[in-house]
């Protein structure tokens, strides 16, 4: 859907806006972007911030001081969606006394609700789905012309035309595939993110080369289902396989000078291949950290979720990773209290957590989402069961995480310093190759001082469930 309104009551046909060239009008106002949800949303927000700065906007010191407020929203769980409406209500009240304020809702709630958002919050100026992030300037031009705009049509995503305003100068998100073609029965992502659209390997490498030239040292390749990268691109190899896969992309970008670390997320067990595992082992810049959601440790629940794999397949993936890379970190996502989940099936999930020994786990109790099959089923579990199972799950996750981190005590780990610890300015914080958050002093042996962007060898002397602390060793690789 693509609509713009001269007022909340009058419809103006402007569907051609999607192909209009961006304007060059300069704005003197300020903006504030609030991001909810996943890494894809964070990357989209960086892109939109870059567009706004190119238009002449500057970032406001606080949300309530901004001339343009943009909420980049998430609908994967109900509590995230309700939080957005709370923020919007506050800004809608503000706009009644500050009519110059531009109020924008982007992301998945915008895609899901569309024009209904205008009826619920008539103070909105722009409602735009995630496929329109790169069209922000053209859409705001319509707003400047006095129209309310809804942009939720299923569009080909424009190649990145504007330099993103990165929230870090060390680590960068790089979108490589948008959308998702899976049909998991609980998930709203395909209906709000659209079908899979892979960027070309050439465009991705060009972006990464630009990041390296600006001093970035780590990149994370992003996709809702990153293992599906390239299956919508043309080309077959003489061996009969797809010419463009995530494995091929890793080889294609690996030699970009200046980039020290490469990560990727999020993987799907159904498409996680032996060839990909071997590439991660062979390519030294690819970090030994794999985010592979398993969602449930019970095959019947996985079938009801339409996940397309079994617990046995998941085990084989984990075993092969650890066979080649024994110290690799594996993180995951888990949903408990899915409709119809029995006590025994829940216990199977806990058993798999114990068996694998995950390093990090994103946990959630099932939340019915609009336009998903599971939301219509009659075997929904009581809220009390959801709360209790999530409580048990989180307790186990924390215990396992502490056990896994305890293995690092006394060891020396290479840490990429990402910034100052906001709670202790005398400390830097960064991550190991296995994605452990690590804190250490800004000053090392013999008065050596470290800065964000340095690769520092840290001797770990304190472990917690979700972070490490340590002391710098002499060896360091400066960013400069």
UniProtKB/Swiss-Prot annotation:
Residues 166-403 form the Radical SAM core domain. The keyword Oxidoreductase does not apply. Coiled coil: none annotated. Binds 2 [4Fe-4S] clusters. One cluster is coordinated with 3 cysteines and an exchangeable S-adenosyl-L-methionine. InterPro entries: Elp3/MiaA/NifB-like_rSAM, Methylthiotransferase, Methylthiotransferase_CS, Methylthiotransferase_N, Methylthiotransferase_N_sf, MiaB_methiolase, rSAM, rSAM_horseshoe. Residues 29-145 form the MTTase N-terminal domain. [4Fe-4S] cluster 2 binds at residues 180, 184, 187. Keywords: 4Fe-4S, Cytoplasm, Iron, Iron-sulfur, Metal-binding, S-adenosyl-L-methionine, Transferase, tRNA processing. The keyword Metal-binding applies. Its cofactor is [4Fe-4S] cluster. One of its GO terms (biological process) is tRNA methylthiolation. Signal peptide: none annotated. GO terms for molecular function: 4 iron, 4 sulfur cluster binding; metal ion binding; methylthiotransferase activity. CDD domains: Radical_SAM (cd01335). Residues 406-474 form the TRAM domain. PANTHER family: CDK5 REGULATORY SUBUNIT-ASSOCIATED PROTEIN 1 (PTHR43020), MITOCHONDRIAL TRNA METHYLTHIOTRANSFERASE CDK5RAP1 (PTHR43020:SF2). Catalyzes the methylthiolation of N6-(dimethylallyl)adenosine (i(6)A), leading to the formation of 2-methylthio-N6-(dimethylallyl)adenosine (ms(2)i(6)A) at position 37 in tRNAs that read codons beginning with uridine. Monomer. This is tRNA-2-methylthio-N(6)-dimethylallyladenosine synthase.
């Amino acid at each position: 859907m693509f609509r713009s309104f001269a007022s909340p009551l009058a419809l103006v046909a402007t569907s051609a806006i999607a192909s209009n060239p961006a304007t060059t009008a300069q704005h003197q106002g300020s903006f504030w972007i609030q991001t909810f949800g996943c890494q894809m949303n964070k990357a989209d927000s960086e892109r939109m911030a870059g567009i706004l700065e190119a238009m002449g906007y500057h970032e406001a010191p606080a949300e309530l001081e901004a001339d343009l407020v943009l909420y980049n929203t998430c609908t994967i769980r109900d509590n995230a969606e309700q939080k957005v409406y709370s923020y919007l209500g506050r800004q809608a009240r503000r706009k009644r006394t500050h009519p110059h304020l531009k109020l924008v809702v982007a992301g998945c709630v915008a895609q899901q609700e569309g024009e209904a958002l205008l009826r619920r919050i008539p103070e909105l100026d722009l409602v735009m789905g995630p496929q329109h992030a790169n069209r922000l300037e053209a859409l705001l031009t319509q707003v400047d012309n006095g129209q309310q705009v809804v942009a939720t049509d299923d569009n080909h995503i424009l190649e990145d035309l504007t330099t993103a305003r990165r929230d870090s100068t060390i680590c960068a998100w790089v979108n490589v595939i948008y959308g998702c073609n899976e049909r998991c029965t609980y998930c709203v992502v395909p209906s709000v993110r659209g079908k899979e659209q892979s960027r070309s390997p050439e465009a991705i490498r060009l972006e990464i080369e630009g990041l390296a030239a600006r001093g970035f040292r780590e990149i994370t390749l992003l996709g809702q289902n990153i293992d599906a990268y390239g299956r919508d691109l043309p080309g077959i190899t003489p061996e009969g396989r797809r010419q463009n896969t995530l494995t091929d992309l890793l080889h294609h970008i690996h030699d970009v000078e200046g980039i020290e670390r490469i990560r990727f997320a999020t993987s799907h067990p159904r498409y996680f291949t032996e060839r990909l595992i071997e590439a991660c082992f062979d390519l030294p810049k690819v970090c030994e950290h794999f985010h592979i959601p398993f969602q449930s440790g019970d095959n019947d629940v996985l079938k009801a979720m339409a996940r397309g794999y079994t617990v046995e397949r998941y085990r084989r993936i984990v075993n092969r990773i650890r066979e080649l890379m024994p110290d690799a970190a594996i993180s995951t996502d888990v949903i408990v209290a899915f409709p119809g989940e029995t006590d025994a099936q829940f216990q199977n999930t806990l058993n798999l957590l114990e068996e694998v020994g995950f390093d990090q786990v994103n946990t959630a109790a099932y939340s019915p989402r609009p336009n998903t099959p599971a939301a219509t089923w009659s075997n929904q579990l009581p809220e009390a069961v959801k709360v209790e199972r999530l409580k048990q799950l989180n307790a186990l996750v924390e215990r396992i995480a502490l056990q896994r981190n305890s293995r690092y005590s006394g060891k020396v780990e290479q840490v990429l310093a990402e910034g100052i610890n906001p709670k202790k300015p005398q400390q830097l914080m960064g991550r190991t190759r296995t994605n452990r958050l690590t804190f250490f002093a800004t000053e090392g042996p013999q008065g050596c001082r470290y800065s964000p962007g340095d690769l520092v060898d840290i001797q770990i002397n304190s472990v917690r469930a979700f972070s490490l602390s340590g002391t710098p060793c002499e060896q360091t690789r400066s960013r400069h």
